[in-house]
Amino acid sequence: MYKRQGQKSEKEKFAGARATYSIEAMMQDGKALQAGTSHFLGQNFAKSANISFINKQNQSEYAYTTSWGVSTRLIGGVIMTHADDEGMVVPPRIAPYQVVIIPVIKKPEDEDAIMAYIKEIQKDLAGKTPFGEKIRVKLDKRDRASVDKFWEWTRKGAPVILEIGKRDADGNNVMLKERIKLGTPEGKQILSRSDFEAGIVERLERIQKEMFEAAKARRDANIRTDITTPEAFRAYFEQSNEWIEDGTSGKVAFVRGKWCGDPESEEILKAMKITIRCIPFDQSDSEGICLLTGKPAKILFQNCYRRL
C-alpha cells in the first residue's frame, strides 16, 4: 500500500483540533483511503477536562494533547490495494504464513514418503529469516483435495505455495507457485529443493518489493499535475462523473495543484462532491493559480477525488 501524507485543510480537520495530519492511500479503483490520522488538539480538550501540569516556570498550565493512530481500516486498505479477481494478495512482510505447503497424496502408500520429505524441508526452512524475522510456514494436512486447498490459500493471498507429491519427493524437487504471478508462466515453477531453500528469503523480499513498487507506480500514474486553471479543473471532474459498468470512469482519480488556502473556497468542492485529501508536506515555493478561485496561490494541495 503506497500513500501520501500531509495536513488536512481547515474544513477537513478534526472538529476542535488545532491541526490534523493524515496518510492518504490510493486504492485500485482510484479512491482515497484515509489510512491514519494525527490530531494536535492544543489545549482545547484539556480545558474542558481540566487537565493541567506545572511548567518550567513553576506555573499551572493546561496540557497540550494529541489524538492519533491507525485502525483495522488498514486491513481493508491492504486488500483493496493488492487484491485481484481471485482474492487477496498479501505482502510477505505481514502475511500470517509466508510459505504454505500442500501435500499431494494420490495413493495412501505414498503418504509416509511425502510427509517425511516435507518435514525435512520444514526443518531446513526453520532457520530462514526474511525481513529479519523467523519465516512463517504452514503445513496444510487437512483431509481435503489438494486443489481445493490450493485455491483456498490462493484466495487468502499466501505469497508462496508449495505442492509436493511423490514425484517431487523422489526427485528432490518442489512445485512452487507465487501468488503475485498467478496465471503467468513464471507463476508455476519446478525447483530443486536446494535452490528453493537457498532462494526463499530473497524470493519473499523480492515479492514484497514488487508489490510496493506496483502500488507506487499505480499511484503516480493516477495523479494529474497538468491541470492548472479552474476551468480545466471543473471540466476534468465533470467528465470524470461518467461511470461505466466495472465501477471506473476511465479517468485518473487524484489531482495535485495550487490552492489559495481560503476555507470558503472549499464550498466549491462540496458542490462538485470532491474533497481536499491533504496538503502535502513536500511543498514548493513556486507561485501559481488556485484551481478553485483563480487567485494567486502558493499552497500545494492534493488528492481531490470523486465522492460517490
Predicted regions, residues:
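NTP/phosphate- and nucleic-acid-binding module
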Residues: 3-308
